[in-house]
Regions:
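C-terminal region of N-terminal signal peptides and the immediate post-cleavage residues
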Residues: 26-48
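Conserved loop-alpha-helix segment in the C-terminal half of the alpha/beta-hydrolase fold
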Residues: 234-257
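Conserved strand-to-loop "acid loop" that flanks and positions the catalytic carboxylate
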Residues: 134, 230-237
């Protein structure tokens, strides 16, 4: 669950490359459907209006502004882009929230998730015929029945451990559920490694919390079983394999967590 800003600044070219490949995989079949006998290039198909909508889902302890660099590049290339807020209220709730948002979009969608956002897109896109591709950016891609707690425990080195968390109750929370913050002392190294110290400390103060149910809710039938998937992985973070998650990746063959 590393910070989106650090991950994206370091790997923006890789993210854009993965999105280009994923969108090309959507564009080409669409152009072939529209003009079955024509030999169109990806660029020609895109120019003709076949570009999919790209939806970006941020991860834990972050907000939609963490996608700003990616959004700027995609908009410059003529894509329609949405970065809806992730409520961070638990995997079940957050997935339903995103699924409803996706239903408001007409036409094909390339759905992108970072870190915890990968688990959300894994659940939200299941059964949605408009989602044509998934892109995982240093992200979780749990199998059915898995929890993020299980995945985090499977590989040592995660920062999301009790010693680094401040869990605060909130009104109406189910028993045992609270809002988790990364402690301000741990945040710079855990979530903002590579950022200037001043910016890291500001992010520590302004971080949105995530409900602890995000890591305890079991994942449902994964969308990556039926939707083509690509992964952009971080080299410095622990990765957690989701067994049968099939996909494409510049750094690995599967979506990671």
């Amino acid at each position: 669950m590393n910070t989106a800003r650090t991950a994206r600044r370091a790997r923006l070219p890789l993210i854009i490359s993965a999105l280009v490949v994923a969108t090309a995989a959507v564009i080409i079949p669409l152009s072939q459907t529209a003009t079955a006998s024509a030999h169109t290039t990806t660029r020609a198909a895109a120019t003709a209006g076949f570009k999919p909508t790209i939806v970006l889902e941020h991860g834990a302890w972050a907000d939609t502004s963490s996608w700003n660099g990616v959004i700027t590049r995609l908009q410059a290339d003529g894509y329609t882009v949405y970065a809806p807020p992730n409520p961070l209220q638990g995997l079940t709730y957050d997935s339903a929230f995103l699924a409803d948002f996706l239903h408001s979009i007409s036409g094909p969608i390339v759905l992108v998730g970072h870190s915890y956002g990968g688990a959300v897109i894994t659940n939200a896109a299941t059964g949605d015929s408009q989602v044509k591709a998934l892109v995982y950016v240093d992200a979780f891609a749990p199998a059915q029945g898995q929890t993020l707690a299980q995945l985090l425990a499977s590989v040592p080195g995660s920062c999301a451990v009790p010693a680094n968390l401040n869990v605060v109750p909130f009104p109406g929370a189910p028993a045992g559920v609270g809002d988790a913050y990364i402690t301000q002392s741990a945040f710079p190294s855990c979530m903002a490694d590579g950022l200037p110290a001043r910016e890291a400390h500001v992010l520590a103060v302004t971080q949105p919390p995530i409900a602890t149910s995000a890591i305890t809710d079991p994942s449902r039938v994964p969308a990556w079983q039926t939707i083509p998937s690509w992964a952009v992985g971080g080299r410095r973070r622990p990765r957690h394999t989701a067994g049968s998650a099939a996909g494409h990746g510049g750094e690995r063959r599967r979506p990671h967590h």
